[in-house]
Amino acid sequence: MDLKAKPVLVTGATGYVGGRLVPQLLNAGYRVRALGRSVAKLKGRPWGGHPQVELAQGDVLDYDSMAQATQGCSAAFYLVHSMLADPGTFSETDRQGAENMVKAGQDAGLDRIIYLGE
């Protein structure tokens, strides 16, 4: 299994971990599909204009956007946690996003999903 043959998806690419992972993946020879809720924020990253980076807008809470984002990828890094969620709904919101990632990844035939736990 050659994970470099297709792009890898990085969710939460505008966040602390995602923003630092993208350049590491590029240095290792991967093509990256960087997912964020705002393409403008993705473009503003130092790697936003890199020729091996595809910018994608989406939200892990929206299954359709996750299904589209995972298509054609070999693997996905799930680096999103619901920091903006109401404290009373944090767990539910976080669970829904993770479930969407897993289902979209299975439907797209991803070889791996790498999950950043708490």
What are these regions, as identified by a protein language model?
Residues 35-40, 59-60:
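N-terminal Rossmann-fold cofactor-binding loop
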Residues 2-30:
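N-terminal Rossmann NAD(P)H-binding glycine-rich loop of SDR-like oxidoreductase domains
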Residues 80, 114-118:
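Active-site beta-alpha turn of Rossmann-fold NAD(P)-dependent dehydrogenases/reductases
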Residues 7, 74-75, 112:
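Structural motif
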Residues 29-31, 52, 110:
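A generic structural signal for alpha->beta connector loops
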Residues 44-108:
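NAD(P)H-binding glycine-rich loop region in Rossmannoid oxidoreductase-like domains
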Residues 12-18, 58, 72, 97, ...:
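Glycine-centered flexibility sites
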